[in-house]
Amino acid sequence: MDSLTIFREIIRRNELGGDLSHAYRFSDPDGVRSGKSGWSFGLCQFDVANNPSAVLCLRECQFTTDEILGLKRQDVDIVPLNRKLACNTRTVDRWDDRQLFECLTHASEVCRASGIRFASDEVLFHLADYHNQFYLSRGGKMHQFLLGVGRPVTAQDILIFKLGLAWGKKRPDDVHRRFSNIRNVWVENFA
């Protein structure tokens, strides 16, 4: 199985709890309409407020500027917009595929350019999942952590880093769930 197909399955489990039907309706990423994020959609859970690709995808799906602003602010009637999104599954899938490919490519390129090696190919999927959630920036916290490991990076190293984040301290169960999903998909395809 190719890396993109494997990563698609990882993201399906991590972002949608395994239920692909959730990709075609809007969800509140933090569950409390905190204002930190807008509504999210797609397999990759594009955050309308923080991901420019989300807006481009919605424009291609014929969402109006007012609808997109309402999704960003989370102050719009979501029911008709869910119907509109569900009519554009092929467009959403195409943007998801771009995002998945970009996550794998970006994580690989950042590490390769910095001389960071992986103890196994599984590590790339953990980093790509991190990138889909947070963005793996050159010189950022994760990148600095990886540079400091001083040996080939393991999946366990990524887990330890994530558990040290505010999200990891607040939701260690979610960090472990995501880690287990990645590990399980990896084992299902390569064991």
Model-derived segments and their meaning:
Residues 1-117, 122-191:
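Cell-wall polysaccharide-cleaving catalytic domain and substrate-binding groove, primarily
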